[in-house]
From Swiss-Prot:
This is ATP synthase subunit alpha, chloroplastic. The gene is atpA. The record marks 363 as: Required for activity. It comes from Hordeum vulgare. One of its GO terms (cellular component) is chloroplast thylakoid membrane. It is found in: Plastid, Chloroplast thylakoid membrane.
Amino acid sequence: MATLRVDEIHKILRERIEQYNRKVGIENIGRVVQVGDGIARIIGLGEIMSGELVQFAEGTRGIALNLESKNVGIVLMGDGLMIQEGSFVKATGRIAQIPVSEAYLGRVVNALAKPIDGKGEIIASESRLIESPAPSIISRRSVYEPLQTGLIAIDSMIPIGRGQRELIIGDRQTGKTAVATDTILNQKGQGVICVYVAIGQRASSVAQVVTTFHEEGAMEYTIVVAEMADSPATLQYLAPYTGAALAEYFMYRERHTLIIYDDLSKQAQAYRQMSLLLRRPPGREAYPGDVFYLHSRLLERAAKLNSLLGEGSMTALPIVETQSGDVSAYIPTNVISITDGQIFLSADLFNAGIRPAINVGISVSRVGSAAQIKAMKQVAGKSKLELAQFAELQAFAQFASALDKTSQNQLARGRRLRELLKQSQANPLPVEEQIATIYTGTRGYLDSLEIEQVNKFLDELRKHLKDTKPQFQEIISSSKTFTEQAEILLKEAIQEQLERFSLQ
């Protein structure tokens, strides 16, 4: 019988001791006492931060929102159907963050930045906090560069600048999403990264928007963040912050970004649902007391950065839905007070066939002409005043039996100006063509035409100008001013087109 020598035993023991590698760690673990309706109550999580991520035993994640003396209120980032009472929950020690990279361009993702378009995983080496602080006062500079939407009514009278927050507000089915998507389509070739955030919408509506982006070649520079109507309230609440984090990634890399939140009414409703289930005290319209902060901390992240930070920008176009045109409701007034102006879409104008249905009278941009090129200021300076006078005169004309010649001419001019503001969807115009269109209307060249002929004439004029007077576009795009030479070229093109049109 073989016997082990002392040195062999010593060697075996040494090897075993060297292989022994026991890690000692402390984990913050709690237990589920109640779960349901997307909310879980946990006991035992003593040291946990507000907003910290937690991991349930069956894989679902959640965010700690209510820190109470006896328990912690967790909102679930999933349906949580498999979570059982008494199961364990582990605090991760991390605040919610998402991966970010250039690879997100052209993709459709959810509120956790996971792809939902079936095109495979997205490779990202960096990450950003979903809720990061807004740039400080010193980090910003005033808005001075225009962000062209391609819509004549906006670019001429309610201009938007890079780094601005402009609210799009109106009833349902008034074309709010169409204004936002047309703005994205118009950024093609402008070096602007676009993020479209769909919150609580029908999957068919989001699919339609994505299809439009693909058809028009806009997905190359666009990221779509989508949480549908059947998504948990937590994810609908997080989606705008995820979109903002993706846009910020590009902004801090000296790029220009545009973000659309479609729409913040749905986010507020999701937050109200979460807050009521967490037993937070309800306020006006049953919204919690911090619903203003919900939107202000999101929209304050839009900024124009100063030269030390690279002059990047993030322009936000939040959308808010009103009920029967009531802009004095809680959420609309909150967002109006946070933003730098609003574009009001009217159901009456939409039903009258004026599309985009922008009510120019009560729409405003608080940045104003600082966000316009000089050529647009020169040509469109008085158009808002003329349209306001036309609206006033039109209301008066309903009661007056006879109008003098001057008033009749003013009414005729106003009707043609309103007609030239009409644009079909997915047909944004470059700023040079907008300037030509507005000049034609404000200088009275359309007065001799029937109203039904105005848009046909303008379409043909823009084509004629592009084909025969390419120098016009070159002058405007290079000098940004409406020079005498540009005016001569435009007048020639208008006269030629009027002669051709009269022969038809």
